[in-house]
Amino acid sequence: MPLKIAVLKETRPNERRVALVPVVADKLTKLGADIHMQSGAGDAVKLADSAYKNVTMNPDPIALVRDADVVLTVQPPESSVVEAMKEGAILVSFIYAHKESELTKRLRDRRITCFAMELVPRITRAQAMDALSSQAALAGYYAALLGATNLARILPMMTTAVGSIRPAKTLVMGLGVAGL
């Protein structure tokens, strides 16, 4: 019997990520996985349902998770989803266990194994599963763009026939894997 994977549409405000992209879905189906995805899960990142080949679409998240072996989400699932998951299922998600203690207790009580993506160590052996580094890199890039947008002057040095404009001076602070 093939492994049944359910992928849910994100429901939190301003969340524009999807837990599974078409390229990875293709690889998993070639390995024999049976993938079921909530309709519109990729809409926020401009991935239409038709981009997911050999994936069954369903608008109902509860029906999707009811008999799924593995459930994929980006943000922690809603309590109704956890309640509908079968005992012994696996959840792969950012769950923020330190903030979401009720969710963590509910997962434990329902005997659901959870791979908390925010807790995957940033080490060489776990590099293929390191979701935090890529997300931190995107956040840093976004912060630089946001900072440049809010500067009172222009960021790059400009030299024209009329004259030159000195560049703005900036200080970038952060701590991450690359900075250690």
What positions do the PLM features span?
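Glycine/serine-rich phosphate-binding loop and adjoining beta1-alpha1 elements at the start
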Residues: 2, 10, 79-169
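An N-terminal-biased, well-structured beta-alpha scaffold segment characteristic
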Residues: 2-106, 110
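Conserved N-terminal Rossmann-fold NAD(P)-binding element of oxidoreductases
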Residues: 8, 171-174
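Hydrophobic/small residue at the entry helix of a nucleotide-binding pocket
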Residues: 178
